[in-house]
């Protein structure tokens, strides 16, 4: 049985839950022994402890710092792109290769169908997303979700294919960054990302980008130019990770918490700055506490957004996308 991953700020809650579980076991044993007084006493203690657990759970997860949200976004049990695809969509057909160099397993994509009988909605989409692994072997296979140039070129090939068949594009963003290796630079990492930004801006089909976990720098925005940008409540999106920011500014990773605060990288921060359009609420404690509920929420919002975007003509889609990104940022003009 896999060991449960407990983050540092979750330890007090985990310890209390362990104590609660032990008491429930004792209650079960006590009930079997027909010890009525002991059973009643344990039941009362359990009720009190359950209230404490609920109160502590809300106190922790409703008051997360920016750094704690970064930690949740990186949680190894969090649902990844393929999890969302199989929970939200049907008939997924993965397409491989960039037709130039090779196939990148850190960035996957293909046609799939989103169906929602309650809303009378059915639509084939091109879904593209970063894919991480859950253990050492799969992480090496997926390169820890860090895409190579061939991954971004594959993504662009699939987007152009979607445009050819007039199908919307849905991207799922979850990466610690584009792969920074020498080989990636030799193969044109910067050019591949820049080309995607240019081409995505002009796609004549609806494009929806969903930040489901980590959204680091060019690795994220390489598939992140959309008409609508949705962001999970405990995801992060920034030009740099808190650790890298800390190492540049303070020559040490020790100041990552301060860096996270300064970067303003949470969904709330980015909604306020009008960089993202909607925040996707997560189950209390993070998406990994109820992946199916999280996938249902994402699917519901995708259906809502797709229905609206599919009514727009291609020229409006392109113009709105360009205007959206041109309006981002804050600057001053001196006379």
From Swiss-Prot:
Enzymatic reactions: N(6)-carboxybiotinyl-L-lysyl-[protein] + acetyl-CoA = N(6)-biotinyl-L-lysyl-[protein] + malonyl-CoA
Name of the protein in its database record: Acetyl-coenzyme A carboxylase carboxyl transferase subunit alpha
Species of provenance: Chlorobium phaeobacteroides (strain BS1)
Assembly and oligomerization: Acetyl-CoA carboxylase is a heterohexamer composed of biotin carboxyl carrier protein (AccB), biotin carboxylase (AccC) and two subunits each of ACCase subunit alpha (AccA) and ACCase subunit beta (AccD).
Primary localisation category: cytoplasm
InterPro entries: Acetyl_CoA_COase_a_su, ClpP/crotonase-like_dom_sf, COA_CT_C
Signal peptide limits: none
Family affiliation: Belongs to the AccA family.
SUPFAM superfamilies linked to this entry: ClpP/crotonase
GO MF annotation list: acetyl-CoA carboxylase activity; ATP binding; carboxyl- or carbamoyltransferase activity
GO cellular component: acetyl-CoA carboxylase complex
Alphabetical keyword list: ATP-binding, Cytoplasm, Fatty acid biosynthesis, Fatty acid metabolism, Lipid biosynthesis, Lipid metabolism, Nucleotide-binding, Transferase
Record's keyword annotation contains Metal-binding: no
Pathway(s): Lipid metabolism; malonyl-CoA biosynthesis; malonyl-CoA from acetyl-CoA: step 1/1
Span of domain CoA carboxyltransferase C-terminal: 48-308
